[in-house]
Amino acid sequence: MTQIALTIAGSDSAGGAGIQADLKTFAMHQVHGTSVLTCVTAQSTVGVFEAEPIKLSLIKAQIDVVAADLKPDAVKTGMLFNSETITQVTQRLKHYALTPLVVDPVMVSRTGSKLIDDQAITCLQEQLIPLATILTPNRYEAEILSGLKIDNLEQLKQAAIAIFHSSGAKVILAKGGSLAGTEQGMDIWYDGKSIKTLFNRTVTTQNNNGTGCTLSAAICANLALGQDLWQSVVNAKKYVTLALENSLNVGAGNGPLGHFFPLLKSD
């Protein structure tokens, strides 16, 4: 039987992030990938130059036909662009009871740049995030969701706990990257019972565009394959590290991960 995963996110014309990264990740996990497009960007490795949302009726139609016919085994959300899109997506997820749900709360880039407005952030917090099986904020998104400043590992832990108790999400995976006082990358897992730190070797590369998208997509793919939540996160972290180690040196800026690294020819 073929497992099916669904990504609800935006398009990256450079192929490094968004649904392009998600579908590559699904394919690498031998999961059939389906997609609902929420916005289109004119994007290269050096930045985003233009973006337009998909009209709400078409977003609804995409979710309806995929959910009714293909019945995804797991779902992830990424860039939802504005509050109207967030509301539409939330309503359809509820209508079809689509779970497990990985919510990548795309609000702030990994460098700290805001990606959606305050109204959309509030909408995300009030409507979509409470449905999440697992929520995967980066450091800056965790600061917004918790109201806490994060400069070290202990503060990241406190933020994860605060987000859990305020958000309604079943599990928080707060992504710390390389924080002060640490030589490794780390994420914090909190499920209301135990708090765990996941360490990984740091990969030094400028070709890291789409890292967050790839992680949430890999978690989603593992869930679709029937792995439990913790093992899905562990497997996804390993996959992202290997994809970073085999990232692609393309374009003038931040290139993409090597999603298909076992298939890549060595130089």
What are the residue ranges of the model-derived segments?
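Conserved N-terminal subdomain of the carbohydrate kinase-like
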Residues: 2-7, 27-103, 107-110
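Short pre-catalytic strand/loop immediately N-terminal to key active-site residues, enriched for Gly-Thr
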Residues: 8-14, 195-209
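Phosphate-handling active-site elements
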Residues: 30-34, 195-196, 222-236
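Charged C-terminal helix
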Residues: 53, 230-267
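Conserved phosphate/ATP/ADP-binding segment of small-molecule kinases
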Residues: 118-195
